[in-house]
């Protein structure tokens, strides 16, 4: 799931707190961090 223009991450919901947040921090964009958490959670549910 793309978010924040900083890339795509497909993973388990448990990844969102680490991987997605790290990607968001690279973008230095609060919206990317929040979007990353949501996308990690959503992709975890989607499998």
Curated annotation (Swiss-Prot):
It is found in: Secreted. Stable between pH 4.0 and pH 8.0. Keywords: Antibiotic, Antimicrobial, Bacteriocin, Secreted. Thermostable. Retains 100% activity after incubation at 60 degrees Celsius for 60 minutes and 15% after incubation at 121 degrees Celsius for 15 minutes. GO terms for cellular component: extracellular region. One of its GO terms (biological process) is killing of cells of another organism. Belongs to the bacteriocin class IIA/YGNGV family. Has bactericidal activity against various Gram-negative Campylobacter, and the Gram-positive L.monocytogenes and B.subtilis. In vitro, inhibits C.jejuni strain ATCC 33560 (MIC=27.3 ug/ml). Antimicrobial activity is lost upon treatment with proteinase K, pronase, pepsin, trypsin, chymotrypsin and papain, but not when treated with catalase, lysozyme or lipase. This is Bacteriocin curvaticin DN317.
């Amino acid at each position: 799931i793309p978010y924040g223009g900083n890339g795509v991450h497909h993973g388990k919901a448990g990844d969102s707190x680490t991987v997605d947040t790290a990607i968001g921090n690279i973008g230095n964009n609060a919206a990317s961090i929040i979007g990353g958490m949501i996308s990690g959670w959503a992709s975890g549910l989607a499998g």
